[in-house]
Amino acid sequence: MDKRHDPSRRIIAPHGTQLSCKSWLTEAPMRMLMNNLHPDVAERPEDLVVYGGIGRAARDWDCYDKIIEVLQRLEDDETLLVQSGKPVGVFRTHADAPRVLIANSNLVPHWANWEHFNELDKLGLAMYGQMTAGSWIYIGTQGIVQGTYETFVSVAKQHFEGISKGKWILTGGLGGMGGAQTLAGTMAGFSVLACEVDETRIDFRLRTRYVDKKATSLDEALAMIEEANQAGKPVSVGLLANAADVFAELVKRGVTPDVVTDQTSAHDPLNGYLPQGWTMAEAAAMRKTDEAGVVKAAKASMAVQVQAMLDLQTAGAATLDYGNNIRQMAFEMGVENAFDFPGFVPAYIRPLFCEGIGPFRWVALSGDPEDIYKTDAKVKELIPDNPHLHNWLDMARERIAFQGLPARICWVGLKDRARLALAFNEMVKKGELSAPVVIGRDHLDSGSVASPNRETESMLDGSDAVSDWPLLNALLNTASGATWVSLHHGGGVGMGFSQHSGVVIVCDGTDAAAKRVGRVLWNDPATGVMRHADAGYEIAKNCAKEQGLDLPMQE
């Protein structure tokens, strides 16, 4: 019997102000763990899978139950340790220490590969935490929408003089991460054709308004895109098809999209990518009998897809890797020039990272959407001179359906995160919000990740693979008083290719919370500015000076 599978489970986080735990400092991680497994949030909640192939919230259902039990009895001077989704110890610390410390999927570098991890996973000794799955701060597809939107806006500026009208994006994948592309693309003014092999994912994106239309043939999908472009109104189409097949067919037909990318779960060739010509049922059966054969077939299909992306780039498409390591997989299968198209971070996002700007997010523990709308208004009040940000907040309210507990993503940087968080804490204190909020972020942030094929690709000083930085980030956030801190390996790009840390803090309206919030939400983005200044980026050096950071080697 698989202890990770229980179709009878239906997890819904409590709403309102009644506590199941001894304080909001422990109620918050409990609710956020449960929210990760909400049926509208998680991809396969019955298997504890939140997103990204096999990114889980807990190692198995026994571990999940025990985590909930411990959080409900945990005192405010105790800390729970979670090792790859398993609660392994409770220790006396102090009131300003984290209530939970999490380490997921970490392996000694020589053994940091999928083969070794999968053996440990089968034995029940490990859990793949992805980024926000195992760190209990996933907010559904909204969590990546703004970052994807910012990327597509930058693509329009760099390649099309800022004009996206009448242009379209080709991509693959409509899972927890990839599902953001269709909505973000249309928000940025592009039409989007997204290939997806799992029809239930397309239907889910239709229900939650991330996808406008569904197509079952390439001709039908292209006709929808053409009609929308002629009308001057962007449309998103979920095409039920294998991305490798579609990308190669477009090359064959001589049809060139304006932009090409991909967000299939290519980082995990065993569990995340369906080989060409295979059904999902066939792949599921083969995973039980011939893992090596599945991996080989998946990577061969990735090579076909990447070769098509290169061909489309040659034909004039703006082509980018969106951080799923598909170039690496194709390179390993003999596509020697797989890295000829850039990753999205060095091409479009790094200047933001240099100022500590990244995916700041918050969640209303009350479950009341009005709490999010009030905080949206507070952000506009405190940052009055940023029309781009205001436009994002307006579009988010109008077009993004909440999944589970109401939440908001908002890319802001060093100069704004702490003051926004302190304002939220004050709103809780004054009763303007009906319950506390939690503030966290993706591990994809400026100072919290080492990932040479994604966030730290092509660093100015060649320090792409140096992973001291996320370790320092996690240590500093722990020392600063975050409510829970996590340190993971392999998120986004797969085993052996990344290390990264996460942080979440509770704004419960107390003076003690204000002190913790002020430290954590200054120090956390400041490590990103520090990391980029150390690598030689002038934007980061200037930001550090302007914000008064004490960086000894920058004097």
From Swiss-Prot:
Keywords: Cytoplasm, Histidine metabolism, Lyase, NAD. Disulfide bonds: none annotated. One of its GO terms (molecular function) is urocanate hydratase activity. Binds 1 NAD(+) per subunit. Coiled coil: none annotated. It is found in: Cytoplasm. It holds the Pfam family Urocanase_C. It is an enzyme of class 4 (lyase). HAMAP family: HutU. The active site is at C410. This is Urocanate hydratase. The keyword Transcription regulation does not apply. Catalyzes the conversion of urocanate to 4-imidazolone-5-propionate. GO terms for biological process: L-histidine catabolic process to glutamate and formamide; L-histidine catabolic process to glutamate and formate. InterPro entries: Urocanase, Urocanase-like, Urocanase_C, Urocanase_central_sf, Urocanase_CS, Urocanase_N, Urocanase_Rossmann-like, Urocanase_sf. GO terms for cellular component: cytoplasm. Its EC number is 4.2.1.49. Belongs to the urocanase family. Its main location: cytoplasm. Pathway: Amino-acid degradation; L-histidine degradation into L-glutamate; N-formimidoyl-L-glutamate from L-histidine: step 2/3. It comes from Shewanella baltica (strain OS155 / ATCC BAA-1091).
